[in-house]
Amino acid sequence: MRELDAQLALPLNREAQLPVEIERAALLGALDRQGEAQAAFIDILRRHPTHFSALNEFGTLLAAHGSIDAACRVYAEAILHHPDNPMAHVNLGNLLLRANRHGEARTHYEAALKADPDHAAAHQGMGAVLSDEGNRDGAREHFAKGFRGHAVSTLPYRGNGPPIPLLQLVSSGGGNIPTAPFLDDCVFLTSVVVADYLDPATPLPPHRLIFNAIGDPDLCEPALEAAIRLTAHSKVPVINDPSAVMRSGRIDNAAR
């Protein structure tokens, strides 16, 4: 933060300082200084009301703190002024998908893919829409394009002290345990691994704990098989062993 403040104190024109202002506002949000971050973004947008990065980062801040309706409005404003930028379409689509507004989400993912046919996050979102609608073949096609080479992502850490690095295993097509209520982002630095699309050659982020969030063996067999292989040689504790989850399917339960 001090480095950004020092850059803003330099005698540069305001246009040249704008990216630094946006970075500083986003950092305030990451530090959980919500009020200051929001005020900083509002000040920037008062001067630059159509600036894409400012709108997009402000929408991301609002969504991260649960102001979903406000975030949707900000993303929609970004789309209004930048209709061919796929990122705002994807961000708005993701929020609409969370609200089970699948038709509207699909429209935005389609717009993103029209602008950029290889956009990984748009393929991931479209796959989720199709999966929820029961179109497994269509979902797999989009998931393959969206997650191959993009199977590992890291969530923001909002704590003050050193985090506990954690690996969270998930399935691409749903059937995952909701973890937000207990994987505190002020305690854990969480790297999410989409197990069924992880290239074995991809190095895993540093971690001291693995949490398997894949919970439906009937829906997620390929992901569980990949999770079993991934954890077989792990030297760190594994919570919710994928081998045990695999044995809890309807067929296994019926056999017992």
Model-found features: residue ranges?
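Conserved structural position within tetratricopeptide repeats
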Residues: A9-L12, I42-R46, A76-L80, A111-K114, ...
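Helix-start (N-cap) detector for alpha-helical repeat units in TPR-like alpha-solenoids
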Residues: L18-P19, F52-S53, P86-M87, A120-A121
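Short coil turns that delineate tetratricopeptide repeat
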Residues: L12-E15, P49, P83, P117, ...
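Conserved N-proximal alpha/beta basic substrate-recognition cap immediately N-terminal to
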Residues: V152-P165, V170-R256
